[in-house]
Amino acid sequence: VLEKPCGDCRGGGRKEKKSSITLKVPEGVNTGTRLRSSTNGEAGLQGGPNGDLYVILHVRPHEIFDREEDDLICEVPICFVTAALGGELKVPTLTGSASIKIPASTQSGTTFRLKGRGVKNLQGYGTGDLNVRVNVEVPARLNKEQKAKLQEFADLCGDDVNPQSKSFLE
């Protein structure tokens, strides 16, 4: 038993000290990834070596992309004319944007894969994919001429205007 223990360590031989360190965070980390910083942990007992500091990461959700392992998922709206007739669509990526070809008769919920446009694998085994899911949007307001043209289209289609609902009811 110490007769006069130190005021800083109370006789334990160690005292608490706050410090900042810089860690290199590799590409591909996800929530729960644990990084180790050697000898930046608690001081060793009786002059022994310092312990290691472990930092558990929490990755903030992205405003555009959802993540499933190394793959990214992105939902993009398209107009119903592009869905029906096909066309080109510019989509966001981690590094900018890319164009995808939308085939005619594309349905809402269809997913297009852009290989290698996801997140780098933490162990260095390639890169995930970017999966773009399209949501077909119908105009909220139509003028008289647009309504007339759509009605004309519906009349031309007859019973085939909604083929999926037909198979659903059978």
Positions of PLM-derived features:
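Non-catalytic interaction modules of co-chaperones and other macromolecular assembly/maintenance factors
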Residues: 1-170
